[in-house]
């Protein structure tokens, strides 16, 4: 099949989760091909590697693309110490990364 660029979306922690003292930021990367993809997290512009869990779904039976999620897990205190959260996906379909981000103070 032809190469396909991922559709990338980012989600801040839910208010319910923050109430319980945790904070997970999730980045979804959907319907890309081939499977090789690189995901980078940045907090206030600095790359973050701790606390990241990547999970792939099985290859889609209809269109043979791949999807994955990348979850950045923090404590509520740590989450609230920073403002800018960014997920960067690097895939062969684009020379520059696909970047999705949000600012905590705008959620």
Swiss-Prot record:
Disulfide cysteine pairs (residue numbers): 27-87
Cross-referenced SUPFAM superfamilies: Immunoglobulin (SSF48726)
Gene3D superfamilies (UniProt xref): Immunoglobulins
A Pfam entry, by short name: C1-set
PROSITE patterns: IG_LIKE, IG_MHC
One GO term of the biological process aspect: B cell differentiation
This protein's UniProt keywords: Disulfide bond, Immunoglobulin domain
Residues annotated as domain Ig-like: 6-103
Cellular compartments per GO CC: extracellular region; plasma membrane
InterPro entries per record: Ig-like_dom, Ig-like_dom_sf, Ig-like_fold, Ig/MHC_CS, Ig_C1-set, Immune_Resp_Modulators
Name the UniProt record assigns to this protein: Immunoglobulin kappa constant
Species, as recorded: Mus musculus
């Amino acid at each position: 099949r032809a190469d396909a660029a991922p559709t990338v979306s980012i989600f801040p922690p839910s208010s319910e989760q923050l109430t319980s003292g945790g904070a997970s930021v999730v980045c979804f990367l959907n319907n890309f091909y081939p499977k090789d993809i690189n995901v980078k997290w940045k907090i206030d512009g600095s790359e973050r590697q701790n606390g990241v869990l990547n999970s792939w779904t099985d290859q889609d039976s209809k269109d043979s693309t791949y999807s994955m999620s990348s979850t950045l897990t923090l404590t509520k205190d740590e989450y609230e110490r920073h403002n800018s959260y960014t997920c960067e996906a690097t895939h062969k379909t684009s020379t520059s990364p696909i970047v999705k981000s949000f600012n905590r103070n705008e959620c």
